[in-house]
């Protein structure tokens, strides 16, 4: 995988991959503040990779030291990224063309600078709806969630969801069984999730895309589950609440947050007996029952203040999105350039590829590729199956 300088800066500064010691990655608020400072100085985020530039920043010495420590772990990051890729997990940053365009457009300073993902990332650029609701949904709610997901799929819409039990998993399964596609923003345990047999098969079939804004090995927390709600709403063309408690729970909190921020049009199943649905309607959610009208027509014809009315876009058409920085002007980083000096230093005497791979904790296939490049550059020499440093 090849990353731009700006993307690598985001990965180094905003993730905890390979961090040892007491220092921590930047918070979203710190990252946005740093970005503004760099921009106001007339520089780019990529310049943070230059130690001399960091010294010029009008920030505290403690902050400078934090940036120095975070950006100085390039070799470790390269190994971690390779480890993730071997599992089928990749990274996209706000500086990449593949970053979900609606998150960037709607969330702005609230968008996560780095997302981990598994699956076909082009799905994130497709028009779709969010189907959300309680874990303890009743039988009628289950049936409604299934029918809505099936209707959306027949109309070539992606299902955006949160991957939780209850409404999330019911709508996801219904869409996939109907031949549709799912983009799921999960709040924890991406590494564990992709070990599920059904998930693996759906990823291979390009039916599901999983996103997480936290380290793939991070476990569950209520805060992280709540935080990912905004991603679901921002990514969707419209959001449909199947079943919600009143004044509590992730469904209620996420729906109210969406109403307050106007990320997407909000609909609530009007036949649900739960008080939460009724209260959401009183707060501005649009009452909804399944009808002959297409979902996109329902969304576009339903008035709701301060919400952008998107025109229908075919599911298989991806719009080009503007990016915050001109990638053409950005230097591209090959992970090989990050690790090559450390690889050379790891060779003692004569060693074969397997020994070097084990010493550096890198898969042999990847090591063979890098060793071949080192030989071609004259940094090491090869004699049959053995590698050594030049005399």
Regions inferred by a protein language model and the residue ranges of each:
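Short, small/acidic-rich helices and loops at N termini and domain boundaries
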Residues: 1-95
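Glycine-biased, small-residue-rich flexible motifs in mid-sequence functional cores and linkers
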Residues: 1-27, 43, 86, 93-391
């Amino acid at each position: 995988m090849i990353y731009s300088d700006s993307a690598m800066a985001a990965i180094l500064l905003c993730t905890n991959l390979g961090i040892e010691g007491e220092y921590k990655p930047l918070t979203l608020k710190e990252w946005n503040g740093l970005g503004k400072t760099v921009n106001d100085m007339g520089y780019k985020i990529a310049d943070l990779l230059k130690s001399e530039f960091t010294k010029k920043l009008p920030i505290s010495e403690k902050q400078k030291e934090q940036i120095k420590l975070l950006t100085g772990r390039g070799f470790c990051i390269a190994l971690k990224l390779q480890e993730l890729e071997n599992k089928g997990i990749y990274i996209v940053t706000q500086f990449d063309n593949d970053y979900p365009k609606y998150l960037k457009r709607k969330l702005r300073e609230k968008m996560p600078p780095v997302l981990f993902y598994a699956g076909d990332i082009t799905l994130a650029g497709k028009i779709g709806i969010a189907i959300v609701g309680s874990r303890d949904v009743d039988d009628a709610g289950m049936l409604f969630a299934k029918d809505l997901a099936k209707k959306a799929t027949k109309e070539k819409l992606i299902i955006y969801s949160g991957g939780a039990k209850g409404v999330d998993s019911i709508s996801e399964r219904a869409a996939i069984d109907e031949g549709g596609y799912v983009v799921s923003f999960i709040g924890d345990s991406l590494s564990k999730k992709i070990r599920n047999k059904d998930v693996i098969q759906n990823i291979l079939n390009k039916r599901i895309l999983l996103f997480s804004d936290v380290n793939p090995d991070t476990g569950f927390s209520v805060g992280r589950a709540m935080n990912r709600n905004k991603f679901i709403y921002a990514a969707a063309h419209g959001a449909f609440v199947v079943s919600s408690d009143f004044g509590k729970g992730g469904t209620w909190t996420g729906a109210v947050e969406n109403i307050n921020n106007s990320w997407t049009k909000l609909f609530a199943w009007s036949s649900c007996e739960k008080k939460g649905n009724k209260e959401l309607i009183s707060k501005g959610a649009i009452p909804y029952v399944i009808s002959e009208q297409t979902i996109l027509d329902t969304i576009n014809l339903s008035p709701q203040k301060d919400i952008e009315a998107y025109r229908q876009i075919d599911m298989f058409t991806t719009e080009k999105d503007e990016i915050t920085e001109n990638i053409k002007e950005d230097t591209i980083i090959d992970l090989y350039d990050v690790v090559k000096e450390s690889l050379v230093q790891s060779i003692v005497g004569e060693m074969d590829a397997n020994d070097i791979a084990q010493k550096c904790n890198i898969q042999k296939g990847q090591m063979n590729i890098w060793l071949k490049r080192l030989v071609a550059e004259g940094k090491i020499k090869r004699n049959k199956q053995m590698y050594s440093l030049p005399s």
